[in-house]
Structures are given as structure tokens and as C-alpha cells.
Amino acid sequence: LPVVEALAAEGFVVSVDTSRPEIMTAAAKAGAKILNDVRGFDLTGAAEAAAATDCGLVVMHGFDAPRGSDIVASVYDYLAKRTTALRELGVSSDRICWDPGFGFGKTVEAILN
């Protein structure tokens, strides 16, 4: 994490993309201001680790939507569920950003529609 420390020391806002709770904790201590999790803070301990920091949290829908499903509803429902889990851990809404995960298991047609 020396790169995070060096960039933060220079005044940059550093975002770390990880799903691992121990990396989230270490990155925040090193000066990261944003944690971005392609799994939506869904791995065991990830939501708790993220909530224990002061970082902004990017909740991403990073996998395929079920075939034949309404992709908008599927993505929305997942992001809402993960946001509820974070809010229940005391994370304020102003720390949470949604990323619908364009390019992760979604066709160009689905993204544009």
C-alpha cells in the first residue's frame, strides 16, 4: 500500500478497488478515500470493514443479470439490497455511490436500453 500512502500524501483522492475486508481496512488506514467493490460489499466481513472506515463506498453490480430478467430491476434490486445492508451498519447515504457495472455481464443493448 505504499502507492496509496504516497498519492494520499500528495493530496490525491485515492480509490481502491477490492472485495477483501483486510485490504479495505489497510487501504483506508493508508489514506484511501474511496472503496470500490465489484461484489457490492457482499463477501463475508466486507460490509463491516467498509462501514468501519470514513471512506466513500462504491457499490457495484459486477456480474451477469439473470437471463430473461428485467436488467434494470435486477441491477436496482441488488444495489438497493446492498445499500440497505450498509445503512444497517451505520453508513450514511452520502457515503454510498451506485455503479451499475457497465461492461460486467451486460450487453451493449442492455446498457443502452
Spans of model-derived segments:
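Conserved anion-binding
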Residues: 24, 30, 38-109
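Charged helix-capping and loop-helix junction motifs
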Residues: 1, 76, 111-113
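N-terminal active-site wall of soluble small-molecule enzyme domains
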Residues: 1-34, 38-45
